[in-house]
Amino acid sequence: MTGVQITGCFSSRSNETKPESGERPTPASASGKRVLLAYFSRPGENYSYGGRTNLKTGNAEVLARMIGGYIECDVHRIEAADPYSDDYDATVARNVREQDADARPAIANPLASTDGYEVVLLASPIWNVRAPMIMSTFAERYDFRGRTVHPVTTYAMSGLGAAERDYAASCPGATIGEGLAVRGEEVRKADAEVRSWLRRIRLLQD
């Protein structure tokens, strides 16, 4: 795949690379299945315990990096063609407009293909009970029939929110597998929760 932001995994031994056309996706170590971890994350001003905090790295990216540290997978960061503001209130207002319009925000760096992946992990924050609308843009762009899609979310109050329902609608023919929801304020201490979930969905062995 040329011109695609893909990494083998998040780890100290891996740098961001762009596989050449025809390169096969990385096999997962435990299941033998090929796994794509696609995530959207927003740094900047974020909600935290009823207040605000400025994050250099968004919570969903922290969670994606944690997952990528435990399994072999290809990782794709979804970038908005029109980047979201670092300002919390501005992002909230934009998200409300996008939800009300059932918008599909453009992606700056779409993958050329998701062929070859058997398991897809879709990671994002939950905004107003739903994954950001750009996740629907991504999910609807590809044919996930016959694949297993696992929602992965960071949240303030809503857990997985409507992510399972939305991905079921966006990914016809896919199996929506067990999701993982981690409170944003606690994501940096979620190692045990992440490992337990990866074992349950059989991507990590004891």
PLM features per residue range, with description:
Residues M1-T2, I6:
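N-terminal export leaders
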Residues G8-Y117, V129, R199-Q205:
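N-terminal beta1-alpha1-beta2 submodule of the flavodoxin-like/Rossmannoid cofactor-binding fold
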Residues L37-Y39, V75, L122, P151-T153, ...:
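Structural beta-sheet core signal
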Residues R42-E45, A80-S85, I126-R130, Y155-L160, ...:
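Solvent-exposed loop/turn segments at secondary-structure junctions
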Residues T57, E61, R65, P132, ...:
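Short, surface-exposed alpha-helical segments at coil->helix boundaries
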Residues L63-Y70, D74, A123, T137-Y142, ...:
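Structured segments of extracytoplasmic/periplasmic soluble domains
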Residues Y88-P172:
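Helix-loop-strand module that forms the ligand-binding subsite of alpha/beta enzymes
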Residues T175-D206:
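Glycine-rich phosphate/pyrophosphate-binding loop and the adjoining helix
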